[in-house]
């Protein structure tokens, strides 16, 4: 019995097993660095195939190579990840989300701006523009505050809107610009203001009418009318001259513009109805001649 017990002790000391006849290899303790297990060292030991019975070193390195690569990564992968994210993307992520459209309060202010322009409410239009309302904001039919003001002939509101950045060439749902609407409603001062504000000088509407056509129509009405007072006729002729001056200046016709300057000076010196009618006739002749020249240029 003693011999048997001694044999067992010898087997345990030598590390041999009585069951399989092979050597039992004790696993190596994992190295520790600062209280943390170094998986990189463990991966290296596995990759080398040390301590694995019945497996060659080359075969072990081939089969466990992917584990070694994984375990040899940095201890703090979050820092590496953070470095790969572009700085601009981090700033955008930290920035609060921008609103995709106007708020309900802003929508109400924009509608109020268009309604006020349509109602000729100059004070409200001015206040809303000073508060930051967008003068180019349109309704569901594409109409802006400038469209309404131009159609109504309110030159003061038109000038306010232009001063705050309104687009004189913005089209509504039907393709009409503010200049189209001012021409259709025969508002000569508004046409002059829009031309000064950058409105295009090509055809006013789809019929191809220009300020020259409008001026001729207005002058024909003045020549046929006999009931208007002197000051009313003089004011209307003056407005037509200013419109044509601005229009011809935009076209680069400086000689014709000088002719209009002479007519304007002559109009200011009139004191009787006959003198005003004479200037009106001269202006009508000038307009007809300009229309003929314009027609010949298009051919």
UniProtKB/Swiss-Prot annotation:
ANK repeats: 108-137, 141-170, 174-203, 207-239
Alphabetized GO MF terms: protein kinase regulator activity; protein-containing complex binding
Keyword Repeat: yes
An annotated GO BP: nucleocytoplasmic transport
Source domain of life: Eukaryota
Pfam families membership: Ank (PF00023), Ank_2 (PF12796)
GO cellular component, one term: nucleus
Main location, first listed in the record: nucleus
Annotated motif Nuclear localization signal (NLS), positions: 98-116
Region (LYN-binding): 140-240
Compartments, record wording: Nucleus; Cytoplasm; Midbody
UniProt-reported outcome of changing residue 289 to A: Accumulation within the nucleus
Keywords tagged on the record: Acetylation, ANK repeat, Cytoplasm, Nucleus, Phosphoprotein, Repeat
Chain positions found as N-acetylalanine: 2
Positions of short motif Nuclear export signal (NES): 282-292
Tissues showing expression: Expressed in a variety of hemopoietic cell lines and tissue with high levels in testis. Highly expressed in ciliated cells.
Segments of this protein annotated with the region Disordered: 1-27
Phosphoserine: residues carrying this PTM: 62
Record InterPro entries: Ankyrin_rpt, Ankyrin_rpt-contain_sf
Quaternary data: Interacts (via ankyrin repeat region) with LYN (via SH3-domain) in an activation-independent status of LYN. Forms a multiprotein complex with LYN and HCLS1. Interacts with TSN2, VAV1, DBNL and LASP1.
Function as written in the Swiss-Prot or TrEMBL entry: Plays an important role in regulating intracellular signaling events associated with erythroid terminal differentiation.
Name of the protein in question: Ankyrin repeat domain-containing protein 54
Source organism of this protein record: Mus musculus (Mouse)
